[in-house]
Amino acid sequence: MRSEVPSSTSPSFLSPPFIHLPLLSLSSPTPLPHSSSSTFSLFSTMAASQIGLVGLAVMGQNLALNIAEKGFPISVYNRTASKVDETLDRAKSEGDLPLSGHYTPRDFVLSIERPRSIVILVKAGSPVDQTIASLASFMEPGDTIIDGGNEWYQNTERRLSDAHSNGLLYLGMGVSGGEEGARFGPSLMPGGDFQAYDNIQHILKKVAAQVDDGPCVTYIGEGGSGNFVKMVHNGIEYGDMQLISEAYDVLKNVGGLSNEELGQIFDEWNKSELESFLVEITADIFKVKDDLADGGLVDKILDKTGMKGTGKWTVQQAAELSVAAPTIAASLDCRYLSGLKEERENAAKILEAAGMKEEVNAIRGGVDKKRLIDDVRQALYASKICSYAQGMNLLRAKSAEMGWDLNLGELARIWKGGCIIRAVFLDSIKQAYQRNPNLASLVVDPEFAKEMVQRQAAWRRVVGLAVSAGISTPGMCASLAYFDTYRRARLPANLVQAQRDYFGAHTYERVDLPGSYHTEWSKLARKSDPNVAAALH
């Protein structure tokens, strides 16, 4: 995981001299100028590939096979030759797919028909720059580079500018769905040059996941918008996973439910408004037995959660844009705290010695399990609405800052299939933004407002019960606090502003008069109450 936001001012990826190669007639019977020892193809070397892909780790390999299976001849390349061989073997075993493997950047680039479109799926940061540099010398004006990794959006904007200075087109394309999605249909979020998208949209629309209202791909917008949207998608994913883990924690430790019962419950929830990929896989996880010891495998997994940085970037961007995203921030904080395993174990011992008592056992005896299960279902759904609202508000704020003109309803649509956060209620989010493209928040959409109001009593019961039992539910608590804060016409922020004016002369506005005001608070306090003056001295 990168601990800092990547710099957007690193050297150009096109530092090697750009070479404009003479046009080659790829449609002629003359073989491409590479040796047979450096290229192997499952289809005739006389035909040029329609697209290329570099980076044959799990995601790249599966996406390449997906493209080939959809009928688009593809060239692949990887610095490690064994990965090329492995991909060729898979292409043959999975149906003699039209995929050709190449072992040098030159042979790889020249095997693709013009204007070339090359997808890069390597580790974000400098490896992307290095990969582009190795390819760019053999590319020509009008060719396109497509970065499909989880890249910091400003790096994409820098590379896009570098590409333009050399006549190339550039896309930063978020790819979501994991290895299965890449192989059978991911959600794709391409942003950058529209011409680059237009050149390959016929391929992307076939490769992407398919839902009732079309393929899960759309042109996101200019610049680094595609990577930014994928980043926020991942931030929402952090929130989703945290909320589900809290539902599990309450049901297991307050409700006393077994893994078998939890598997059944999540299966049932996956037939409700909670139907989603993450709920589905959670049900599966509870059903898996440990093959090395007794009991369920999930109980043997160390309670430390990893991360790669996109959640952190999301929270940083929310702070920079003054967008409240407490549910996503809470999920990030929980990942940090999960990493403090030894500290947490030590804290548990010290606090127990100091007299800390676990209340969960006493509370468990009086719990109505059936009601608890239904309450947790409602609390989870209401909390999810708040988490998605925060992510959408962040996208709207960034779109306004950058002039991207993001279509939030369309983003919800392409997340309905293929991606990790795919869920049935994304269709409701799509419809909310179709009803009102300028919707201030999902919380105030008429349909979602009804859902929230109907579920708030159950939501409060779950959070209150968890607090009483000493079970932390930071995501649900943050979501409920967000809801309660957002719906209040007047907050205690007036006192905070008075304090700021008291110690820093930051001024304040009044509710009854226009303008800004400053008050000599300590002086007036002494005048109004002699006891205050005495206390201050």
UniProtKB/Swiss-Prot annotation:
The keyword Plastid applies. The active site is at residues 230, 237. One of its GO terms (biological process) is D-gluconate metabolic process. Keywords: Chloroplast, Gluconate utilization, NADP, Oxidoreductase, Pentose shunt, Plastid, Transit peptide. GO terms for cellular component: chloroplast; cytosol. Its main location: plastid. InterPro entries: 6-PGluconate_DH-like_C_sf, 6PGD_dom2, 6PGDH_C, 6PGDH_Gnd/GntZ, 6PGDH_NADP-bd, NAD(P)-bd_dom_sf, Pgluconate_DH. It is an enzyme of class 1 (oxidoreductase). NADP(+) binds at residues 55-60, 78-80, 122-124, 150. SMART domains: 6PGD. Homodimer. PANTHER family: 6-PHOSPHOGLUCONATE DEHYDROGENASE (PTHR11811). This is 6-phosphogluconate dehydrogenase, decarboxylating 2, chloroplastic. It comes from Spinacia oleracea. The gene is pgdP.
